[in-house]
Amino acid sequence: MSKNVVIIGTQWGDEGKGKVVDLITDKVASVVRFQGGHNAGHTLVINGKTTILHLIPSGILRNHVECLIGHGVVLSMSALLKEIAELEVADIDTTKRLKISPGCPLILPYHIELDNAREIKRGKAAIGTTGNGIGPAYEDKVARRGLRVSDLLDPNLFASKLKEVMEYHNFFLTHYYNANPVDYQTTLDEVLSQVEQTKHMIVDVTEQIHQHIANDENILFEGAQGALLDIDQGTYPFVTSSNTTSGAAVTGSGIGVTDIDYVLGIVKAYTTRVGGGPFPTELIYDVALDKGDEIGKVLGTVGHEFGATTGRQRRCGWLDMVTLKRSFNLNAVTGICLTKLDVMDTLETIKICTSYEIDGVETTIPPFSAEDYAKAKPIYIKIPGWKTSTIGTDSFDSLPVEAQSYIRKIEQLANLPVDILSTGPDRLQTLILKHPFE
């Protein structure tokens, strides 16, 4: 019997979702992206070769897998074509297996200009967006003025709609942000030339998904970013512009709620965050100044904690079970995939945050506001480190006893099983204790 599995990052993104998606797609007919845009990077390492994807589902490296981009994704045609070209250079064919929903909102040049103009105007209060136009594109969608992939199929209608919406946005760019306007004709010509290269990929993705279900075929739904960046449930306003929880798989693809059989929550063995926002367990280290917390330095250096999309340094800290337990509930997580355990191989002692102290009161419930988060002081339990390499370990029993204890403690605190364990960046450096599709 087939299964529909959702993979979700349970923290602030960068948990290692791409590798895990690629690994378990050996058993699927299709992989579906359902939210976000090209603001997130999924890094895959196969036989030592690194591939970074931003828009295209991570199943593209499997020749038998169909890759679907659902209507919940905001789509930059420029970014998509760039990614396709990079894959073709690596002899990975996308033309027959990549499909795009006509309902995808388009990211256009004025969205990017607005994104960057806003960050400049915010100054020190900048959110830390990737500057790729994701937020403004989602705003247009909600305001019902956004252009969608389906609009491109009628060039005359698209030209008319584009002119109207560009007049609106150029007014704000010039009069409020003191920025340069975006040229209408240049934008129109660029986008219409791009659609000729992608027209054959546009299909009814929702119908495609239900055909797979009718044919009793496995489907994997690939989340981007992390649940704690969710526009509604995250650390607002330091969040992304889409819903990043497992529920977005339903709204962003068209699968029914009761059709989801399993949710795999990806958990990094420590915590990272890019950009601004609350981070109670942060171990502050500035890579440019080579100054700050030494363990924060180890986690960032050994873990190569630099963004796949922006190259920005990721903030690092201890595992935070307060936020994680909320995330597990939000996503109805079935099982955990624990990643980057090997990054902590050299540490003498490891800490896990199990509660916060806020205004002198201990709590295991995460605060609602960013202001209260800023006052949260982490309360830790300590676990002995294992001080030996776990890279490429081929069985759970082969792990150091202390590493096993760390994993068991996470399972105990989460009340969930660790079904997959990543012990290195390569596809093969993974222990599947229970396969989500079995």
From Swiss-Prot:
Keywords annotated in UniProt: Cytoplasm, GTP-binding, Ligase, Magnesium, Metal-binding, Nucleotide-binding, Purine biosynthesis
Any Pfam family matching the protein: Adenylsucc_synt
GO cellular component: cytoplasm
Catalytic activity: IMP + L-aspartate + GTP = N(6)-(1,2-dicarboxyethyl)-AMP + GDP + phosphate + 2 H(+)
Top-rank lineage group of the source organism: Bacteria
Pathway the protein acts in: Purine metabolism; AMP biosynthesis via de novo pathway; AMP from IMP: step 1/2
Family matches, as SMART domains: Adenylsucc_synt
SUPFAM superfamilies in UniProt: P-loop containing nucleoside triphosphate hydrolases
Binding site for IMP: D14, E15, G16, K17, N39, A40, G41, H42, T130, R144, Q225, T240, R312
Entry binding sites for Mg(2+): D14, G41
Binding site for GTP: 13-19, 41-43, 314, 340-342, 422-424
Record's cofactor remark: Binds 1 Mg(2+) ion per subunit.
Oligomer and partners: Homodimer.
Similarity remark: Belongs to the adenylosuccinate synthetase family.
Function per UniProt: Plays an important role in the de novo pathway of purine nucleotide biosynthesis. Catalyzes the first committed step in the biosynthesis of AMP from IMP.
Name of the protein this chain belongs to: Adenylosuccinate synthetase
Source organism (scientific name): Ruthia magnifica subsp. Calyptogena magnifica
Gene from which this protein is expressed: purA
